[in-house]
Amino acid sequence: RPAGGRAINRRSMLKGVGGIAALTAVGAGGSLTASAPAQAAGLSVVEHQDGGRMQYYRFSTPSIGWNPAVNVLLPDGYNASRRYPVLYLLHGGGLNADFRAFDYEGIRDLTVGRELIVVMPDGGKAGWYSNPVSSNVGPRNWETFHMSELIPWIDATFSTIAEFSGRAVSGFSMGGFGALKYTAKYYGHFASVSSHSGPADLRGPDGGM
């Protein structure tokens, strides 16, 4: 599902995608597999579009006040009898930046021949990959959606290496912050992290945003 968005630096994207290349060797033997059904992750699929390599899903979840979505890019010749490493690719913020921008900027071509699954989740326009203390637009707990619901759902739905050695996370701008935050806070979830133009600290001089 392509959509307009801010231009993405292709060199940075290649580096981000390349960050998981080593995992294909590390996790090739594969291993921890998810045995729970997909719905146990707390997500209900309300829409699915099969685009060949690109699979689009939209969910109902109590964590978000609307139906968030995700693009899942499968490798060429995806085979459910094999196990694949997964790259979680997090988008930046702003009105014209969302998870679909990666497809618009050519992520399919950039990953040709790479034996990995790329997961590009919705993160909101200014969600900062966090659970806000309060919200006047209903729940928007992006951190819970990504870390407690989406990752287990991905592992239950696709043939992944469902352990530390089989996951990497990369992001751009706001997504770069999210990649750093998730890796630091959820130790043992990701074997590789890369942040491109992502702030490491959101606090201003007075300790606020």
What do the predicted segments below correspond to?
Residues 1-8, 19-26, 34-36:
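N-terminal secretory signal peptides
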